[in-house]
Amino acid sequence: MKKCDAYVAVRGAYNATENSDIPSDHLAMYSRTLRPVLNYRVNKTRWVVIRWPNGSMAQGAGMSTEAFEDFFFRVCTMDYARMAKAQRPLIKRMAKADKVHLKGPGTDLTFSIKGLGAVGCAGDRNIPDGEVFSCPVKKSVNGVIQYNTPSIYAGTRFENMRLEFKNGKIVDATASDTKRINEIFDTDPGARYVGEFSLGFNPHIKEPMCDILFDEKIAGSLHFTTGQAYKECDNGNRSAVHWDMVLIQRPEYGGGEVWFDDVLIRRNGQFVPKDLKPLNPTRLK
């Protein structure tokens, strides 16, 4: 990796659950071994990650291959310069915010992002793209979050993930495979703390497909990520794990709200303040 001038990843897995039968301790060893390489690539190189559409991805999205290819190229070729401009007010608001409050069915979570900054993503390193992220103060997270989007991590598919936090740490975790999810969170001490908070707003991505490059950008979504923090918004958390788990807050998924310092930022997947409305799907397409 240190000999690379740039890193371009074109990925198209044919079996997202290929590692589902590998013991958790082996996967943890793999993650710990790979993490220094990933950290160098993310922090020290010029890089971009994209997919190549195939039948497996179409199946995950519940589409025919032809329909998925049309969707894929529509998403990947949208006007990212327009997105970059539209997200600037959200970057400013997030960078200045202190207290964040997430509300929704089964979710009541508070944390601080004070002093950790915010980063906008509009096609520079991910294609597709569409998010603004920050990071919680490590020990500020308290409450419960109930995710409503399936997630594949370390080869295992998880559904109905529910995490309870006390002073930043996951003190209770349940899911469709509760044993496996806790084994992942026991990879290292940092895996039970949070390394990223992000709001997603790509207007073309509406439904989950168990591919996080797409799912974390879903319009009206957020992701609250356990494990390793990014250097751009660094709360000091270190882990071999970086698990983006997605909560969709549009009405058909139960709705929900995002508050910054007692100001309503988004309700039921729609941005509320006037300066953020250009990020709503009907305006951003």
Enumerate the language-model features and the residues they cover:
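Active-site bordering "gate/hinge" segments
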Residues: 1-142, 279-285
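Short, glycine-/Ser/Thr-/acidic-enriched flexible segments
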Residues: 13-15, 54, 107, 116, ...
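Short aromatic-centered micro-motifs
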Residues: 102, 164, 258
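Long, well-ordered mid-to-C-terminal structural blocks that present hydrophobic/aromatic surfaces
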Residues: 138-183
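Active-site lining segments that contact anionic ligands and/or coordinate catalytic metals
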Residues: 142, 158-160, 167, 192-196, ...
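Charge-rich, low-complexity intrinsically disordered segments
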Residues: 144, 151-157, 162, 268-285
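Dual-mode signal for accessory low-complexity, basic/Gly-rich regions
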Residues: 172-238
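Internal helix-turn-beta structural module
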Residues: 210-284
